[in-house]
Design a protein with these regions (language model features):
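Junction motif at the cytosolic side of a transmembrane helix
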Residues: 2-4, 45-46, 268, 272, ...
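Long, hydrophobic alpha-helical segments
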Residues: 166-188
Length: 369
């Protein structure tokens, strides 16, 4: 009972410290939100249409029909193209400046030759490959309507479990807030104890310093769960995030052992490095790197081969690989092997806490304190 009282006392003290030292909460709030904003803005969270120019020099009925086919082409989200220029001179200028994905020209002899001219700024980028595929799709639809296509195909571009890119980024930002918050808050609180000499007082308490570590774990997990509601709410309100109560509750309950493991890692790093200026950049880089290469930015199966190989050995990638599908209702449960790993992550967190405080006490004794 006394040990539980000690853990709760440390937790209450930690909450007061975080209330006064608000800079400790800046990183787990700002880093996921900044990444979420950048991903949504840069990688098409606002829609699917690419800026292109189209010029019709034929002015024939056939060319007008093809023009309309380009303008009417669309995905299940937005139109394929955003036609921002129809003047030939301006289109060439903007294309050479890299302000257009594509310049489509219907020449004067279009009716006779049935040729169109396509000019791109960078033919090798993934965006250019995507926009050329859209052109082919549009031309196939046009030819099918004209009865000139001998083989037709039906493209299924939407699946029942599809989500908006912005919604996927929103879910990833929730998971990033959870594991980054748990790790960095634990490290910050340990560094605070070290820099303010509180660790010596804790060592002399009847329950021992390890109870302080458990109190920090409790605070880190609790606060990270609360902070994650910020990106979750923003995603629901603005990013087309579909909220599934059961799935979200399952994720929040199941991820607690992972958060304990992350808090244990934070305490271990705090015991080793001790100072904010070393701890914070290191943990932030771990979080951002995991987000990009571990399934937060895109599914691991969509990454390049080298990235997939790194993700296979980078243990933190399971946070996004396993929890994102449940969060978006792609899956409704975790497998037995996943549950076993999640449980072991919690055990590892407690083990690292023992090691961290054992290491701290040993250094204090040999340091003459």
């Amino acid at each position: 009972m006394k040990k539980w009282q000690a853990i709760l006392a440390v937790h209450n003290r930690n909450m007061k410290i975080l209330t006064r030292q608000k800079q400790m909460l800046i990183q787990p709030i700002i880093v996921p939100l900044v990444l979420l904003f950048l991903m949504v803005v840069v990688f098409g969270g606002g829609g699917d249409d690419w800026p292109v120019a189209i010029v019709n020099e034929s002015n024939s009925l056939e060319s007008q029909e093809l023009m309309e086919a380009f303008k009417d082409s669309e995905s299940n989200i937005t139109p394929y193209f955003d036609f921002i220029e129809m003047n030939s001179y301006e289109a060439k200028k903007k294309g050479s400046e890299g302000r257009l994905h594509l310049f489509i020209k219907l020449p004067a002899d279009f009716v006779e030759n049935k040729n169109i001219e396509l000019k791109t700024y960078n033919i090798n980028s993934d965006a250019m490959k995507n926009v050329r595929l859209r052109v082919e799709h549009t031309l196939n639809d046009y030819m099918e309507k004209q009865g000139a296509l001998k083989v037709t195909s039906q493209q299924v571009t939407a699946q029942p479990n599809d989500v908006w890119r912005s919604a996927f980024y929103g879910g990833s930002s929730v998971l990033l807030t959870l594991f980054l918050g748990s790790m960095i808050i634990a490290a910050n609180l340990h560094a605070f104890d070290y820099e303010n000499r509180t660790i010596k007082e804790i060592t002399l308490t009847p329950t021992g310093s390890i109870m302080a570590g458990f109190g920090i774990i409790l605070t880190s997990v609790f606060v990270s769960l609360i902070l994650s509601l910020i990106p979750l709410t923003l995603s629901i309100l603005f990013l087309h995030f579909d909220f599934y109560f059961y799935n979200t509750l399952l994720v929040y309950l199941s991820i607690v052992p992972i958060l304990i493991g992350c808090a244990g890692i934070g305490l271990f790093l705090g015991a080793y490095f001790k100072q904010y200026r070393v701890l914070q950049p290191l943990i932030i880089l771990i979080g951002i790197g995991t987000y990009i290469i571990g399934g937060g930015f895109a599914g691991v199966n969509m990454l390049m081969p080298l990235a997939r190989e790194i993700a296979d050995i980078w243990v933190f990638s399971v946070i996004f690989e396993w929890f994102n599908p449940v969060l978006h209702n792609f899956a409704t449960s975790f497998s037995f092997s996943q549950c076993t790993f999640i449980f072991l992550a919690g055990v590892l967190g407690f083990l690292l806490t023992f090691i961290a405080y054992r290491f701290q006490i040993r250094k204090s004794i040999f340091g003459g304190q």
